[in-house]
Amino acid sequence: MANKQDLIAKVAEATELTKKDSAAAVDAVFSTIEAFLAEGEKVQLIGFGNFEVRERAARKGRNPQTGAEIEIAASKVPAFKAGKALKDAVK
């Protein structure tokens, strides 16, 4: 499994940037996507995929320790849907 450091190394290799500059670029991309999602904006990267915020409805659940029914509040969660080019590349 690749991690953030692996991603930074690949970006540095592909762009001939230093690892420090690549780390700054990767961090900037992640924080920018996060900022758009925090504002409720969808981020569409043609060919790669879409990042968006989805609403999870309130629902009933069970406490696994007691078995008592509990109410789980509605929430917002980040979601990613892969684009066609990414799906095709993985096949």
From Swiss-Prot:
Gene3D superfamilies registered for this protein in UniProt: IHF-like DNA-binding proteins
The keyword Signal is assigned to this record: no
Gene Ontology cellular component list: cytosol
Highest taxon above the source species: Bacteria
Any one biological process term the GO annotation gives: chromosome condensation
Gene Ontology MF annotations: DNA binding; structural constituent of chromatin
Residue ranges of the TM segments: none
InterPro entries: Hist_DNA-bd, Histone-like_DNA-bd_CS, IHF-like_DNA-bd_dom_sf
Keywords per UniProt: DNA condensation, DNA-binding, Virulence
Family to which the UniProt record says this protein belongs: Belongs to the bacterial histone-like protein family.
Biological role: Histone-like DNA-binding protein which is capable of wrapping DNA to stabilize it, and thus to prevent its denaturation under extreme environmental conditions. Also seems to act as a fortuitous virulence factor in delayed sequelae by binding to heparan sulfate-proteoglycans in the extracellular matrix of target organs and acting as a nidus for in situ immune complex formation.
Name listed for the protein in its UniProt record: DNA-binding protein HU
Gene assigned in the entry: hup
